């Protein structure tokens, strides 16, 4: 060994020590998770919920678009019809052990019934506990869109009311009268 190699080795050791000491006084990148909350991105896609209208009815009309859009097929539902003609899901089931939280179900939903929340703490010990039913998914509020009501916006007729008589609804147009 010559002097050049010894000086180079000592310099390498001193540089390593300086790097360790410089990192000792910096803020840590690691968070103690349960005590310190993890900062989430503004558009983080977490747990899926079903929302309600401003009137309190559930928004889902059981159109099955969310189940068709789901790439892993973790959503299943069965359509039923109320006395007034409005559709609703008789059962709505999401298997979160298969869900990849892609958000395609939220994009496909015409009524904004399905919404993804920033909640990510869904760990369970048994796989069966990750299958959520409609009662587990329904929340009491309207979610991200508080004033949206599908039946008011879409212009669907309500049984017992003539067309054009609802609030902010234009009178129906007779298309045969405007034909050439």
UniProtKB/Swiss-Prot annotation:
Cofactor(s) this protein requires: [4Fe-4S] cluster
Q: What is its EC number?
A: 7.1.1.-
Q: Where do the TM regions start and end?
A: none
Reaction it catalyzes: a quinone + NADH + 5 H(+)(in) = a quinol + NAD(+) + 4 H(+)(out)
Q: Which residues bind [4Fe-4S] cluster 2?
A: 70, 99, 102, 105
Name the protein family.
Belongs to the complex I 23 kDa subunit family.
Q: What is this protein called?
A: NADH-quinone oxidoreductase subunit I
List the source organism.
Answer: Tolumonas auensis (strain DSM 9187 / NBRC 110442 / TA 4)
């Amino acid at each position: 060994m010559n002097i050049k190699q010894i000086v180079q080795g000592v310099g390498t050791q001193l540089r390593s020590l300086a790097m360790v000491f410089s990192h000792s006084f910096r803020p840590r990148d690691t968070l103690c998770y349960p005590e310190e909350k993890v900062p989430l991105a503004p558009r983080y896609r977490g747990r899926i919920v079903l929302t309600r209208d401003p009137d309190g009815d559930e928004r889902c009309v059981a159109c099955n678009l969310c189940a068709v859009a789901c790439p892993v097929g973790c959503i299943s539902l069965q359509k039923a019809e109320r006395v007034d003609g409005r559709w609703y899901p008789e059962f709505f089931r999401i298997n979160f052990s298969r869900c990849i939280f892609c958000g395609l179900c939220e994009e496909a939903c015409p009524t904004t019934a399905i919404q993804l929340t920033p909640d990510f703490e869904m760990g369970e010990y048994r796989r069966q506990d990750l299958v959520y039913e409609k009662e587990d998914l329904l929340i009491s509020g309207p979610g991200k869109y508080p004033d949206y009501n599908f039946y008011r916006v879409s212009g669907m007729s309500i049984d017992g009311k003539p067309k054009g008589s609802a609030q902010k609804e234009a009178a129906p147009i007779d298309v045969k009268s405007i034909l050439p």
